[in-house]
Curated annotation (Swiss-Prot):
Top-level lineage group: Bacteria
The name this protein goes by in its record: 3-isopropylmalate dehydratase small subunit
Subunit structure: Heterodimer of LeuC and LeuD.
Cross-referenced SUPFAM superfamilies: LeuD/IlvD-like
Source organism per UniProt: Salmonella schwarzengrund (strain CVM19633)
InterPro entries, per the entry: 3-IsopropMal_deHydase_ssu, Aconitase/3IPM_dehydase_swvl, AconitaseA/IPMdHydase_ssu_swvl, IPMI_Swivel, LeuD
PANTHER family from the UniProt entry: 3-ISOPROPYLMALATE DEHYDRATASE SMALL SUBUNIT (PTHR43345:SF5), 3-ISOPROPYLMALATE DEHYDRATASE SMALL SUBUNIT 2-RELATED-RELATED (PTHR43345)
BP terms from Gene Ontology: L-leucine biosynthetic process
Coiled-coil ranges per UniProt: none
EC identifiers of the protein: 4.2.1.33
GO CC terms in record: 3-isopropylmalate dehydratase complex
Protein keywords: Amino-acid biosynthesis, Branched-chain amino acid biosynthesis, Leucine biosynthesis, Lyase
Length: 201
């Protein structure tokens, strides 16, 4: 079972760039592992650090600003997560501590992979995202509340509605990944297996 996602209130970091691809999110040289942990240290590695080893933080990159340390909601521009289909991208984001990404649009494969890893991709209009960028930049350290049950983002004195399809919403609310979904049918699977001839078991 994955962690249930119902509501999250967190610090927002504004990454004001469009077409952020998966190679920028987690560069290919860090993809040797197949477990989901440890990738957060290399998130946006080529932007966060001035050296290849990741030891010299880039003071001009927004994730390194003191006011955004501990951010768990990422605000970005359109076509977030484009490029190759590596699932390591949501792994890196969640391992770093992000629970939500808000953007006008997402690459399809990244969007699906996010739900598989309990990272909530929230799609709002360009105009709404513009408003949120202005709000965050005027109020560094502001927190948003993201309510998956109600499908709303509460930011400042405004509320923004978003839509997640029923199946994915059900899975996130109940902490169901692919294994969890399969285990929901464990009894039916066992009954089916018991009906098979012995030589097929």
């Amino acid at each position: 079972m994955a962690e249930k996602f119902t509501q999250h209130t967190g610090l927002v970091v504004p990454l004001d760039a469009a077409n952020i691809d998966t190679d920028a999110i987690i560069p290919k040289q860090f993809l040797q592992k197949v477990t989901r942990t440890g990738f957060g240290a290399h998130l946006f590695n080529d932007w966060r650090f001035l050296d290849e080893k990741g030891q010299q933080p880039n003071p001009e990159f927004v994730l390194n600003f003191p006011e955004y340390q501990g951010a768990s909601i990422l605000l970005a521009r359109e076509n977030f997560g484009c490029g190759s289909s590596r699932e390591h991208a949501p792994w890196a984001l969640t391992d770093y501590g992000f629970k939500v990404v808000i953007a006008p649009s997402f690459a399809d494969i990244f969007y699906g992979n996010s739900f598989n890893n309990q990272l909530l991709p929230v799609t709002l209009s360009d105009a709404q995202v513009d408003e949120l960028f202005a709000l965050v930049k005027a109020n560094p350290g502001i927190k948003f509340e993201v309510d998956l049950e109600a499908q709303v983002v509460k930011a400042g004195d405004k509320t923004y509605s978003f839509k997640i399809d029923d199946f994915r919403r059900h899975c996130m609310l109940n902490g169901l990944d692919s294994i969890g979904l399969t285990l929901q049918h464990e009894d039916a699977i066992a009954a089916y297996e018991n009906k098979q001839p012995a030589f097929m078991r």
